[in-house]
């Protein structure tokens, strides 16, 4: 069971995302910057070795603290060497201090088994949670309480938390 959990908690945004175009990640960053133009802190979970959206977001929201997390220590080490504030973290046993004060927590292409954990984490720290699925998979169609967003070809689902600091641009 622990092997399954470890695999489930691993980033799904490592090598598979490297096949996505930079335009795809740019569109994600644009969407987030429109939704959270006054964010003070945003955390991407499961960055892996594909920090493309995060890097774009840093340039769009220069006043915000942009943080990355991943379960893979080597990926986190590489992110830190790139000047990205990154932490080793497991969504199944999150270090809530990493997420405290976040306006938004997001995950690009999360495995379905992580979605309830992401929602729980968002509730605990008072942050909104945004997920960008690989495709319009069936398990995304029945997310009670989540808003479906579509912008410039990007489909996302947003679960609003209790963060009073956000200023939605959409």
Q: What does each of the following model-derived ranges do?
A:
Residues 72:
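Conserved SAM/SAH-binding beta-strand->alpha-helix loop
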Residues 39-50:
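Conserved class I S-adenosyl-L-methionine
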Residues 82-94:
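Conserved SAM-binding strand-loop segment of SAM-dependent methyltransferases
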Residues 113-169:
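C-terminal substrate-binding/active-site "lid" region of AdoMet-derived donor-dependent transferases
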Residues 1-38:
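S-adenosyl-L-methionine
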Residues 96-104:
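A short acidic, Gly/Pro-enriched loop at the edge of an enzyme's catalytic core
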Residues 49-62:
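Conserved SAM-binding loop of SAM-dependent methyltransferases across substrates and taxa
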Residues 79:
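Conserved SAM-binding loop
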């Amino acid at each position: 069971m622990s092997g399954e959990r470890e695999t489930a908690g691993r980033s799904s945004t490592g090598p598979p995302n490297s096949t996505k175009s930079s335009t795809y990640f740019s569109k994600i960053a644009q969407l987030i910057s429109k939704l959270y133009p006054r964010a003070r802190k945003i955390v991407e979970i499961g960055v892996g070795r594909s920090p493309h959206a995060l890097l774009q977001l840093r340039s769009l929201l220069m006043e915000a603290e942009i943080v990355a997390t991943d379960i893979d220590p080597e990926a986190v080490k590489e992110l830190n060497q790139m000047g990205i504030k990154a932490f080793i973290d497991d969504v199944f046993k999150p270090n809530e201090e990493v997420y405290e004060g976040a306006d938004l927590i997001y995950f690009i292409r999360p495995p379905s088994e992580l979605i309830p954990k992401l929602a729980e984490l968002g509730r605990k720290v008072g942050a909104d949670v945004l997920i960008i699925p690989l495709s319009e998979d069936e398990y995304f169609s029945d997310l009670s309480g989540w808003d479906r967003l579509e912008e410039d070809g990007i489909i996302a689902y947003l679960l609003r938390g209790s963060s009073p600091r956000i200023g939605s641009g959409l």
